[in-house]
Structure formats: structure tokens, C-alpha cells
């Protein structure tokens, strides 16, 4: 049978989602917990998880979805309670659900939402250390939010996002579709919410880096379109820090009845998380 899980995690202690040699990863922690909960049966049927989004080092998740195959039957909440018993405090399973064999956490997803939380001001906040990005600004200055919003317009739709693509990206194509970008200002915070069908490696962080160049007045709002058209990573801004990036939501066809993520326990404002 195939089981889907909904996860939340603090990505700061980990070298990303995917298993890596001699590095702590979320996939390893989850598979160890699943193996411990399943018990002896896991020896004959090892656990291997497939995820909707392979988050990078330091990136967090509010609504990650994974699936795995098993020959062990459990009630849905038994998976939640049992697996959480073996997980570190930085990772939690919010829900579990048996799904049909044709469901894939990765390939069945048709929309993903990321949120980037940025604190901008003269002093960083130790309270949200590793939970938010930080940009040092003088006390009497703030980002030009309207200029950033204007620059975002050119990114909506289907485009070749090569200028925002990491050299390590394994995607077969740089062409992706962005459905919406919302920039929400609540000084000293700015939140970037981006919805799309899929994203390239470092794509969100590279876009945020460009937004901040424009928000600080170092580039005009029209510069974003120039970067997009160039299809050249060297033209864009440096990759911004991972700390403030959250995989917030993933959407699937209604036929799979995948639960919505539990966002009420996230520290982000309600108007940022959205519906």
C-alpha cells in the first residue's frame, strides 16, 4: 500500500531534504523514524520516501508532502502518533493518509507555494535566528515595496528562468510557470509569497535577491525584465540566504483528497500564509 504524509520541519539543522553522505538530512531522519515504527517488517520491505519538493540546506517546510510504499497496515493517526515518537523535535508529521498507487507526492502536484520571510532593519533579531532572512538597513530607511511589486509583474506566466537557476540544478527544463507573486510589507518585515507549478534549484532565493536590489534602489524596477530576458545567471543578483524560505503549500487534484497543511501553528502572519 502507499501512504502519504504531511510534514513540517525546521530546516536549519539539516543539509536539506535529500540523503547525503555524512550530512544530517530530513529524509534520513524521516526514514529512520518510519523504519523504527514499522519494526521487523521494514527489514523485508525497506522504507524509501518520495517528496514533493527537495528543499535545500536551511530551508523550512510548513506543508511538505511525501509518500512511501509499505506492506504494513496502520490507522492514519497511528502513523502520525507512532512516527512522531521517533522523530527529532525539528520535524513533525501532521497527517497521514492511504493513497492510491498512482499518487506521487512529486509528480501529482500541480502547484507549489513558497514564502520568504525577510526582516529588514538596523539590527537582526536573535529571536528568529535561522527562521527569517535578514537585510541590514539604516534606521531611517526601508525597502521600496512598490518598486519590487512592479518588477514582479514580468515574472508572471510561463518563462525560461535560466537567469535564476543554480548551476547545480537538475531540472530537465528551465521553463516554469509562476501563477502569482505577492509582496506583503509589515515593517520591519517583508514577506514574498510565490505560487507556481514548480521551481528550479535556488530559483526563489535568486528572485528574492533581485527584488532586494530593486527595493534598495540599486536597480530600477525594469531591471527584473532584463534579467529574465538575458537567460544568464551571471546577470542576476547573488543567491540570497536560505533562512527565511518556507515550502508552504502543495496542491493536488481533488481526486486524491490530500489534506491541507496545518498552518495555524506557524509563526507567520495569517494574511501572509493565505488560504
Curated annotation (Swiss-Prot):
GO biological process per UniProt: tRNA pseudouridine synthesis
Pfam families noted in UniProt: PseudoU_synth_1 (PF01416)
Record's keyword terms, sorted: Isomerase, tRNA processing
Domain of life: Bacteria
Binding site for substrate: 114
Family: Belongs to the tRNA pseudouridine synthase TruA family.
Protein name, entry field: tRNA pseudouridine synthase A
Annotated organism of origin: Polynucleobacter asymbioticus (strain DSM 18221 / CIP 109841 / QLW-P1DMWA-1)
Amino acid at each position: 500500500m502507499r501512504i502519504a504524509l504531511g510534514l513540517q520541519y525546521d530546516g536549519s539543522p539539516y543539509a536539506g531534504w535529500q540523503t547525503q553522505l555524512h550530512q544530517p538530512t530530513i529524509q534520513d531522519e524521516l526514514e529512520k523514524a518510519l523504519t523504527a515504527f514499522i519494526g521487523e517488517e521494514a527489514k523485508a520491505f525497506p522504507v524509501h520516501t518520495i517528496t514533493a519538493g527537495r528543499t535545500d540546506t536551511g530551508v523550512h517546510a510548513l506543508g511538505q508532502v511525501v509518500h512511501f510504499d509499505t506492506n504494513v497496515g496502520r490507522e492514519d493517526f497511528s502513523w502520525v502518533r507512532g512516527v512522531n515518537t521517533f522523530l527529532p523535535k525539528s520535524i513533525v508529521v501532521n497527517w497521514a493518509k492511504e493513497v492510491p498507487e498512482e499518487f506521487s507526492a512529486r509528480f501529482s502536484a500541480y502547484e507549489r507555494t513558497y514564502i520568504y520571510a525577510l526582516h529588514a532593519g538596523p539590527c537582526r533579531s536573535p529571536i528568529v535566528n535561522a527562521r527569517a532572512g535578514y537585510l541590514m538597513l539604516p534606521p531611517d530607511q526601508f525597502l521600496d515595496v512598490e518598486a519590487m511589486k512592479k518588477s514582479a509583474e514580468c515574472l508572471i506566466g510561463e518563462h525560461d528562468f535560466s537567469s535564476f537557476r543554480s548551476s547545480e540544478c537538475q531540472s530537465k527544463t528551465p521553463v516554469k510557470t509562476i501563477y502569482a507573486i505577492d509582496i506583503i510589507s509589515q515593517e520591519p518585515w517583508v514577506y514574498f509569497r510565490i505560487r507556481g507549478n514548480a521551481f528550479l534549484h535556488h530559483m526563489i532565493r535568486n528572485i528574492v535577491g533581485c527584488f532586494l536590489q530593486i527595493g534598495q534602489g540599486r536597480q530600477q524596477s525594469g531591471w527584473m525584465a532584463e534579467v529574465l530576458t538575458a537567460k544568464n545567471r551571471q546577470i542576476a543578483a547573488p543567491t540570497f540566504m536560505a533562512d527565511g524560505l518556507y515550502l508552504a503549500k502543495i496542491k493536488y487534484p481533488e481526486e486524491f483528497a490530500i489534506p491541507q497543511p496545518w498552518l495555524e501553528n506557524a509563526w507567520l502572519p495569517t494574511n501572509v500564509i493565505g488560504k
